[in-house]
């Protein structure tokens, strides 16, 4: 799904990431569902962008970002202060935005473990799982709170909604619902 990144077109016009991937996939005979997922998996590009509309696009968007985040966490590379040269906060924010609309999302920790195991099996890298999970939990806690803030949820209501902890993907959706319910009272 990253073949378009090697093209001159995407180098010249970065906004065509995904769009060109879809076109290349269709030209090479890929199923239109797969081609659309390739186009969508870059979304959301920022907090004002919408998540992918197709199920395959949402799955690919989350899987790609979780792979990236887990890989960097395994190498002990995490955002610090204002420094985030690899766009890890943006990647985590994208996962949160996608999962916020999913009622049956798999656990974040399970996705992280699967990504770490894939690094071990495919690349021979053995990440310290506990360290990776701890690092990613901190990052996702921050991103979920930022997401609720972007929704206009007051600070005290965000804190109350997040009191139960943020371990699973389903908790992202639950935290959003709790915060919105508290805000409506």
Q: What residues fall within each predicted segment?
A:
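Amphipathic alpha-helical "coupling" segments that flank catalytic cores
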Residues: 2-185
